[in-house]
Amino acid sequence: MLFATFATAIIAFIIVRNSHAKCEKKEEVKNDIHLLADWKLWLGLTLMQVSFGSFYNFFTIYETDFGVSLDMTIYLWSFGVIMEIVMLFSQGRFLQNNLLTILQITTFASAIRWFLVYAFPQDLVVLFFTQSLHALSFALFHSAAISYLFHTYKHQALAQQFFSGITYGLGGFSGALLAGYIYEIFPRELFLSSALIAFLAFVSLRLHAQRNR
């Protein structure tokens, strides 16, 4: 885990350094990103990653607590990754649609996903179905979010850096921390809390979409 975190930090540093080098060769782009003005958008994107805190940090522990074998949790993880890869290869046609609508669909699908994990923690059929939703809640959401920010803001490089830092950085850290506290106090309701957070992300993005009609 520490190696993966360190490697991610190194890669992120290289990407940011290269992006700065490229930006210096281009004309300066005026910053048109206003976090407070678009707070519903950024809150929704961040809450989505907060909801993943339970999954990334406690899914295996949660399932084995309910009697699912460790080998089966490995199969579940692997199936989710396969679904993610399939979506990444076939998402082009989906991204041609309204990106903000896709963000709403994927956050709502994530709320359903986490609720099903909470409601049926031992049902393997349901669990494999929830892992198939990883194609939506991670792969399609991530690509739609990047594309939406790219088309929304003129300062595209800064928008992507905010997305990585705020959404994945702050959101991921907060989600892991919150999941740890919830698991200590209410372990059974861990994924119910994730479902509620993902639903709040959906509501926030929905409100943002209504404002931008």
Regions found by a protein language model. Give the residues of each.
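Helix-to-loop junctions at the C-terminal end of transmembrane segments
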Residues: V86-L99, Y183
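A late C-terminal transmembrane helix in Major Facilitator Superfamily
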Residues: Q156-F186
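Juxtamembrane intracellular "pre-TM" segments in multi-pass secondary transporters
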Residues: R17-L47
